[in-house]
């Protein structure tokens, strides 16, 4: 059984390939530059928006959602939007509430972890969790690991709790349970043993850490066809911000919602718009894979890429220097920021 939901998703209709006269006259689209207008009025399907710093990508994402709803291309319950921070999610909800005459309550807008929490709360039994499961923050997780190590006489100098917490988080970001982790020596085997004990402790105590929110949610979608298909039908329009900062598991989670593997090939459905900037990828130390952007283009057969290159924050001398420096990166997807603000001091 699925939770009651007044929205079953948007009709599988195509948005016009460009804004017509009536759409262009909409107050929603006022003051957008040509690049922003093209991004907001993209046809249904999969697209990549390369959004440089200060290019108004938050405005584009929010206006895109409002435009879809205003023109009847989506219902609130058919939209899922992923932001990088809780602050960005709250800002998006506030903007949409001000822009639209309808309630935005049916939309799923939040961070990966926030959305996974919502999904697991709705399907806690299928996920093997207590209805009232608690979430461990970073400090709570460290305390739990310290307590575990003390109970099992783990040498905390040889296996510092902070390093164990990092190891467990990394395993989960890679989608690995203890049985999936390669062990090449005694230290590796010991860390996997602690990982297993930690999972058992969390399950007994009815708690999950941030990594578990993501991994358990992914496994729920992967292993439960009716639940996965329900949300695939529902979310006809998905928008993901800061795509360059997604990790392996987050991208895999998105694919579960967006399509299925058929004959060894991924077949995506609905409309997924990824917004990101490979020049701003700074979270590799936390598992972020800038390569997810190229994988998205290939696996989702992306036919439309739009570059937001108009910068509204900086002077031209700053942008010229930044463009010159980043041009040495031969693996970037490529864009050049520009401004109308002049050279500055």
What label would you give each PLM region?
Residues 1-131, 135, 229, 280, ...:
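P-loop NTPase Walker
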Residues 30-41, 45-50, 60-61, 80-81, ...:
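Conserved helicase NTPase motor core
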Residues 41, 72-73, 274, 298-301, ...:
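Short, flexible turn/loop "capping" segments at secondary-structure junctions
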Residues 99, 122, 126, 151-155, ...:
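Phosphate/oxyanion-binding loops and surfaces in catalytic or ligand/nucleic-acid-binding neighborhoods
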Residues 102-107, 304, 344-345:
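A short helix-to-beta-strand connector/capping loop
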Residues 115, 303-304:
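N-terminal helical cap/lid subdomain that shapes the substrate entry/recognition surface
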Residues 138-205:
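Coupling/switch/interface segments within P-loop NTPase motor domains and analogous charged loops
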Residues 156-166, 306-345:
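Coupling/hinge elements of helicase-like and P-loop NTPase modules
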